[in-house]
Amino acid sequence: MFSTSNTLLYADKLTDFNMPMPHIYACHLSDQLIQFTGPDKKSYLHGQITQDVNLLTNDALLWAGQCDAKGKLWSILRLFNFQDDYFAITSKDEIENALAEFKKYAVFAKVDIEQNKNHQLVGLFGDDLSAVLSELEIILPTENNSTIDFKFGKAIKLDNNRLILCIDKKAQLPSCITLLESEQKWQSLSILAGEPKLNNQAIAEYVPQMVNLQAIGGISFKKGCYKGQETVARMKFLGKNKRAMYILEANTNKPFEATEVEQQLGENWRRAGKLIQTSFDIDTNRAYALAIMPNDLALDTLLRTKQENPISIEIKPLPYSLIEE
């Protein structure tokens, strides 16, 4: 378990998004934690997910997918190791199914799987994080998607401008941070980074490659068997996958209300795909989304939301390549 004998200083909350933003700010994340303990945790988890758990060192952050027998995703996970236990970060929409599926066969192994409710996940972001890193005594690794232990828990580096802090719920943040009451800005940054996350409607709908999990190192094609492996392998080696996840952006004064997007074909509009995550930045009047659409869709395709008053959408380039080696 985490050791938190000391607590951090209190941070004032910023409730008005139109106020000037500081260089360093944070928000409490709605993402949830699953904790794996026991002598069989590695072998058990290894047989449940798309990732090679042998790669889960103390300083690694690994993406993974948890599939059903047909290869459809129950959840998308980010795994890290701390004090001999494994932790998986997943969304508030995915946690219930993920936990139930992980526990289904745990009775046959020496492993305990529980939702960890004693700790909080805090998204920390800004142009220059050096001041808060110094105050927290965190020396970040140079690599993205890496982790480091520090005196209050675990620091997870996503990139040079974004961290996740996993700390005790009683711990607070340094006074140099402004704590936002909404995670919308964090969610927008996650979407622009092309980081997949499922909403309720997307659970058990897509295979891992449809949410670009292979492009961010979330699938091992060399490991042993796991639930759904046959479908995942067939998608890769037989070229069966026809969909991918795209980043969408719109100039609008309100959030996306639709769950689907349409593309223009001549004078008509046809269904193009579904939204799996959305966010809205009230400061810039920009809405963002992740959508699952055909993987041969051109970046200049005309898109709009499927709703009574459609919103025009543009496709943003992904920050990583979908071309497999």
Which residues does each predicted region cover?
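Glycine-centered loop/turn motifs
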Residues: 59-60, 136-148, 254-262, 300
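Acidic, low-complexity central loop/insert segments
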Residues: 23-28, 32-33, 78-193
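Short, conserved charged micro-motifs
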Residues: 40-45, 95-99, 129-133, 170-177, ...
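Acidic, proline/glycine-enriched N-terminal capping motif
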Residues: 1-76, 80
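Anionic-ligand-binding alpha/beta catalytic cores of soluble enzymes and soluble regulatory domains
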Residues: 166-249
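Residue-level signal for inorganic ion chemistry
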Residues: 38, 88, 126, 228, ...
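Short amphipathic beta-strand starts and helix->beta connectors
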Residues: 14-21, 63-76, 104-107, 145-153, ...
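Glycine-rich, small/acidic residue-mixed loop/short-helix segments
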Residues: 211-219, 233-325
